[in-house]
Amino acid sequence: METLQTWSGRFKRFFLDNKFVLFLLVLLLIGLNILVFTKTSFIFTPIIVLLKTISLPIILTGIVFYLLNPVVDFLERRRIRRIYSILLLYLLVIGLITITIVSIIPFLKEQIMSLIDNIPRYVDVVENQTKQLIGSNFVNQAQQTMNINISDLATKVSDQAATIVNSTFTGVGNFIGALTEIIISIVTVPFILFYLLKDGRKLPVYILKFVPTRLKEQTYTVLSEMNHRLSSYIRGQIIVSFCIGFLLFIGYLIIGLDYASLLAVIAACTSIVPYLGPTIAITPAIIIAIVTSPLMLLKLVIVWTIVQLIEGKLISPQIMGKNLHIHPITIIFLLLTAGKLFGVVGIILAIPGYAVAKVITTHLFDWFKMQSHLYDEEKNENTPGHKV
């Protein structure tokens, strides 16, 4: 028995207390996982199809759950039974949606139709400005210097435009399929949300039933931290996006920018995605401002700068704080990579997914430090009474 324990201890020290061996072991495990996945990817096809089917309803349900659950908890603390609180909240939400559809949607529809009607005028303005630019000495000099043939360039642009139009018609079927999926998801969300609001608190207890007794406390800590990170991010990001949309709406009204309501709604929706969202949001506003006048473009830049300063210095620090502890460069790389791999869904899930993975990885690394002797010096430094 002692011999077995001795060999077990040597084996453990060999893998856990040797940085080089541990590094090779991690590389080996990663390589094996990649190899197995590439050779058996067909096995995961049904799972991927299932995940694609249920991902959108689950994402929408999770977002709405984190928004409404604090309200249900508040009503329950006021001695209103939870199921009655949920039903009351459903009635309020249905009322708000009805008011929005009746009052706001027609106004936005009017602005959208007006924008569509004015597109030919905008095209004419851009075309005239382009002709003036092409006829200027600056462009002629640039053409001679860079050896660019404007006619050939226009022909290539025309051919590319025709290709885009053809691909657009080809993608109509895909658009209809995606629209059907969205409608089905919206219909199923209220039912999933009801049971999640009603029994969501029992979910950690149910998960802990499958966890060994000695790991229950640590697992519960991990689940609680994951829940805190997700709830803080989702609620905070939506509130910040709403504030940005409202501030831009006020600013657009002050400077007299056309389609202020529509542009503010676009800004509020896209601002859910950090860093990249504001860039997408300002693009249509810049186009309309350029077509209007150079002075309007200057006013737009001033309004946008003021709103970004208010958001960065006042709103986000108060609402978001430093809950996720993710560096801005990391966020940008996450958004670019997830967008390339998984599209819009990847952009939306990149940051909360990374936050969850970071919580799990941090706790696993803490467990490893407790098991390994590689970090004994660090543990001694963190011990109470240790003097530096």
Curated annotation (Swiss-Prot):
- Top-rank taxon of the source lineage equals Bacteria
Q: What Gene Ontology cellular-component terms does the record carry?
A: plasma membrane
Keyword vocabulary terms for this entry = Cell membrane, Membrane, Transmembrane, Transmembrane helix, Transport
What Pfam families is this protein classified in? AI-2E_transport
Membrane-spanning ranges: 20-40, 47-67, 86-106, 175-195, 237-257, 262-282, 286-306, 331-351
**Primary localization class, coarse:** membrane
- GO annotation terms (biological process): transmembrane transport
Task: Tell where it localizes.
Answer: Cell membrane
| Membrane topology classification | Multi-pass membrane protein
Which family would the database say this protein is a member of? Answer: Belongs to the autoinducer-2 exporter (AI-2E) (TC 2.A.86) family.
The protein's name is: Putative transport protein YubA
Name its species: Bacillus subtilis (strain 168)
